[in-house]
Design a protein with these regions (language model features):
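N-terminal amphipathic alpha-helix/helix-capping segment at the start of soluble metabolic enzymes
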Residues: 1-25, 32, 76
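An N-terminal assembly and electron-transfer interface module characteristic of large anaerobic redox
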Residues: 2-4, 66, 105
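Short secondary-structure capping/turn segments at boundaries of alpha-helices and beta-strands
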Residues: 11, 42-43, 72
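Alpha-helix-loop-beta-strand connector modules within alpha/beta enzyme cores
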Residues: 17, 62-85
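Alpha/beta enzyme core
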Residues: 17-22, 31-54, 77-78, 94-108
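Hydrophobic faces of well-ordered beta-strands that scaffold small-molecule active sites
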Residues: 21-29, 54-56, 83-87
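Glycine-rich, proline-tolerant flexible connector loops at the mouths of alpha/beta enzymes
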Residues: 30-31, 50-71
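Acidic, glycine-rich active-site loops and adjacent beta-strand->loop/helix elements
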Residues: 60, 89-94
Length: 108
């Protein structure tokens, strides 16, 4: 009987060999230091599968917005994989949303 780790490795190998199917991964911005370590271990493990992009959820409060932005920029910088933020229009003015979008565009 295959172990859980062997099953995951087999699935990862299968995904890396699939052609014609776009795969992406979604992450939540970390709220604690432990969650941040887990996030980056996950990104490192999944990046070799060459997903079309990695997305990061986006909360309405400014602290989570900043964490989302930091994660998106770091994913792109460290992996070269497109990173896509979720944008939430709740609790933000039109002007704030324009500035947030401009910042993402300028970051690549």
């Amino acid at each position: 009987m295959a172990s859980y780790a062997q099953g995951i490795d087999a699935l990862n190998q299968s995904l890396s060999e699939v052609k014609g199917i776009d795969v992406s991964f979604e992450f939540f911005p970390p709220k604690t230091e432990l969650m941040e370590k887990t996030l980056w271990k996950s990104v490192e493990r999944l990046a070799p599968l060459k997903p079309s992009y990695m997305s990061v959820t986006y909360g309405a409060n400014s602290g989570e917005r900043d964490r989302t932005h930091d994660v998106v920029k770091r994913i792109q910088a460290e992996t070269g994989i497109k990173a896509v933020p979720h944008l939430t229009c709740v609790d933000a003015t039109r002007e704030e949303l324009i500035e947030i979008a401009k910042d993402y565009w300028q970051s690549g």
